[in-house]
Amino acid sequence: MSSDELVYMNWREIIMPEKVAVTTTSTYGKFVCEPLEKGYGITIGNSLRRIILSSLYGAAIVSVKFSEALHEYSVVSDVREDVSEIIMNLKEVKLKLDDPGDKILTINVKGEKFVTAADIISGDGRVEILNPEQHIATVSKGGELMMTMLVKTGKGYALAASNKDPEAPVGTIPIDSVFSPIKRVKYVVGASRIGQKTDYDKLTMEIWTDGSVTPEDSVAYAAKILKEQMNPFINFDEDIEPELVEKEHEGAAKNFNENLYRSVDELELSVRSSNCLKNAQILKIYQLVQKTDNEMLKTKNFGRKSLNEIKEVLTSMDLSLGMDLEGFEPPEEDQIKEGE
C-alpha cells in the first residue's frame, strides 16, 4: 500500500449513510440519517442545528410609521391598542418575499374593524403574508388606522436599535425583527446496526418552520453552508485523487436490514400463518426472506392468503421473499443451534 492510498483511507473507509429517510409537510420535517460512525451523530446534528437556527435568511418588518403617532409610547385615536401593543403584534407577522430587496407594506383601515395581517397591502404584490389571521389592532367606530411598514431580509434576530435608519422620515419607529424562518430544531442520536455491530449512530432531526422555507430546503441550505465553511481547511487538490476501485474484500461486512435479525413472532401474523412458520422451523425473519413463493406454498397448511399476508408485512419493512443474503451472518446463538 502506497502512502497516498493510506491517506485516502482516512475518508474512503468511513461508513457513509445509506439514505436519509424524510417525512415532511410544508412546515414540519423529520429526517433520519443512518448509519453514521460513532460520534458523528452529535457532530453533524449539532452543527446543522446551529446553522439552521442562526444562518438562514428570512424577511421581517423592521420599522413602522403611523399617520398620527411619532413614537412607540403614543396612542392612536379610536384604536383600542396603543402603539407599543400594535408593534408587538407586527413582530408576529410572518412574511415570504418573491425576491430580495426592501419592500413597503401599508394598512389603511377606516371605521370599526378587527384588523389582522390580512389587511396588509403589498404595493408590488411580491410579499406573501403567511399568517393572515394574526391580530394587529382593533379600530372603533369612527376611527382609522393608517400606517406604513418597511420590510427587509436578514438572518437571526435584530434589535430595534440596529434597524434604526438615521435618514428615515420623522416618526419612523424601528422595531425588533425576527428574520429566522425557523421556529424550532431538535435532534436525537440513537444506535444503528450494520450486521452484528450496533455501535453506529442514527441521527434523527426534527425541524419546524414558519412556512417561508420548507424543512427539506432548510437542511439542504445548512449542509451547503457547512460544506463551504469546511473547504478552506482542505490543503490538497481533490481533483487529482484517483478514482476509487471497488474491491470485494474477503469477509467485508455488508449492510443488511436490521429487521432480518428479529423473530417472526414480531411480524404479528395471524395464528394460522404463525403456526405454519413454526412447523417449518422458520423462526427468524432472515430465514423467512430466503424462501421463495413456491417454497412457502409447499409448506403444510400454508395457502395463498397466508402468503399474501406475509408479503405485505415484509414489504412494509423493505424486505421480500426470495432475497439473496450472500455474506449475511446469522446471530451467534442461531449458528450454535445449527451446529448442534
Curated annotation (Swiss-Prot):
InterPro entries: DNA-dir_RNA_pol_insert, DNA-dir_RNA_pol_RpoA/D/Rpb3, DNA-dir_RpoA, RBP11-like, RNAP_asu_C, RNApol_insert_sf. Residues 1-237 are annotated as: Alpha N-terminal domain (alpha-NTD). Disulfide bonds: none annotated. Residues 256-340 are annotated as: Alpha C-terminal domain (alpha-CTD). It catalyses: RNA(n) + a ribonucleoside 5'-triphosphate = RNA(n+1) + diphosphate. GO terms for cellular component: cytoplasm; DNA-directed RNA polymerase complex. Keywords: DNA-directed RNA polymerase, Nucleotidyltransferase, Transcription, Transferase. GO terms for biological process: DNA-templated transcription. It holds the Pfam family RNA_pol_L. The keyword Transmembrane does not apply. One of its GO terms (molecular function) is protein dimerization activity. It is an enzyme of class 2 (transferase). Its EC number is 2.7.7.6. The N-terminal domain is essential for RNAP assembly and basal transcription, whereas the C-terminal domain is involved in interaction with transcriptional regulators and with upstream promoter elements. Belongs to the RNA polymerase alpha chain family. Homodimer. The RNAP catalytic core consists of 2 alpha, 1 beta, 1 beta' and 1 omega subunit. When a sigma factor is associated with the core the holoenzyme is formed, which can initiate transcription. DNA-dependent RNA polymerase catalyzes the transcription of DNA into RNA using the four ribonucleoside triphosphates as substrates. This is DNA-directed RNA polymerase subunit alpha. It comes from Desulforapulum autotrophicum (strain ATCC 43914 / DSM 3382 / VKM B-1955 / HRM2) (Desulfobacterium autotrophicum).
